[in-house]
């Protein structure tokens, strides 16, 4: 429920921001068709699949009824871009994805022959600064008074930033030495540096609105908290695909 609420809140904030930008643009008499665009706002939604390659994830999938695919989640995000050159943008980006999955131990039950149950959740919120390079011209200047956008504008990009992550397991667990069942919460959260590469295309739907499709891969890891003592760094990397809308200004 908390993950769904946070996703909805982030989507609402991004949508409201773009709505304000669109309203302000409608009141501006200097339409971009008379000049090349100076930037853009965008919102998107899609699916994020963490790599889940570190030993903490392997321990989880080996012992609990969770598969690597269960760490995938709906992804929502947005960005604001500033044009540096005709084919180069500086982009500030934020996104969020999170999952929560109930599970039980695969090979053990409690003294009453009941499953030993717990819930695993994993949330990621990267904030990055990127350079986005367009593989073709985004449009062309006609005379001194008009700039006409091209129908499709493919691009690639790369960036760096920081990711806030939260990995939690809450419920009943087994003591390795005594086989006793006990309730507990194990949690690791914090900030970690990340890098990413991306590629996509913008498909113009009007003079300043467009459909945007994108794929990205984020790379990063974090040292686990003392709750997960003995494990190596937590893998924060993953692949995401998305589609959304953007507004040029």
Where do the model's predicted regions map?
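Short glycine/proline- and aromatic-enriched beta-strand/turn motifs that initiate or cap beta-hairpins
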Residues: 24-82, 165-167, 242-249
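Gram-negative (and chloroplast) outer-membrane scaffold detector with strong preference
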Residues: 27-30, 81-174, 239-249
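Strand-connecting loop/turn motifs
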Residues: 36-40, 47, 83-87, 149-153, ...
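Residues that define the transmembrane beta-barrel architecture of outer-membrane proteins
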Residues: 37-39, 70-76, 121-127, 152, ...
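Transmembrane beta-barrel strands of outer-membrane/channel proteins
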Residues: 43-49, 92-96, 156-162, 201, ...
């Amino acid at each position: 429920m908390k993950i769904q609420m946070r996703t909805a809140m982030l989507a609402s904030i991004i949508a409201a921001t773009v709505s304000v930008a669109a309203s302000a643009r409608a009141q501006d008499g200097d339409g971009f068709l008379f000049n090349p665009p100076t930037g853009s706002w965008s919102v998107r939604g899609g699916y994020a699949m963490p790599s889940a390659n570190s030993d903490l994830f392997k321990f989880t999938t080996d012992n609990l009824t969770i598969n690597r695919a269960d760490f995938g989640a709906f992804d929502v995000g947005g960005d604001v871009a500033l044009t540096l050159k005709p084919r180069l943008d500086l982009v500030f980006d934020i996104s969020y994805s999170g999952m929560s999955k109930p599970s039980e131990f695969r090979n053990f039950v409690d003294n009453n022959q009941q499953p030993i149950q717990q819930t695993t959740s994993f949330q990621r919120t990267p904030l990055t600064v990127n350079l986005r390079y367009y593989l073709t011209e985004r449009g062309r200047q006609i005379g001194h008074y008009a700039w006409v956008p091209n129908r499709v504008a493919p691009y690639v990009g790369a960036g760096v930033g920081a990711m806030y992550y939260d990995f939690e397991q809450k419920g009943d667990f087994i003591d390795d030495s005594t086989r006793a069942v006990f309730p507990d919460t194990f949690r690791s959260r914090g900030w970690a540096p990340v890098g990413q590469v991306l590629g996509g295309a913008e498909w113009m739907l009007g003079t300043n609105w467009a459909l945007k499709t994108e794929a990205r891969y984020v790379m990063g890891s974090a040292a686990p908290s003392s709750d997960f003592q003995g494990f190596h760094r937590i893998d924060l990397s993953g692949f995401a695909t998305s589609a959304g809308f953007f507004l040029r200004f």
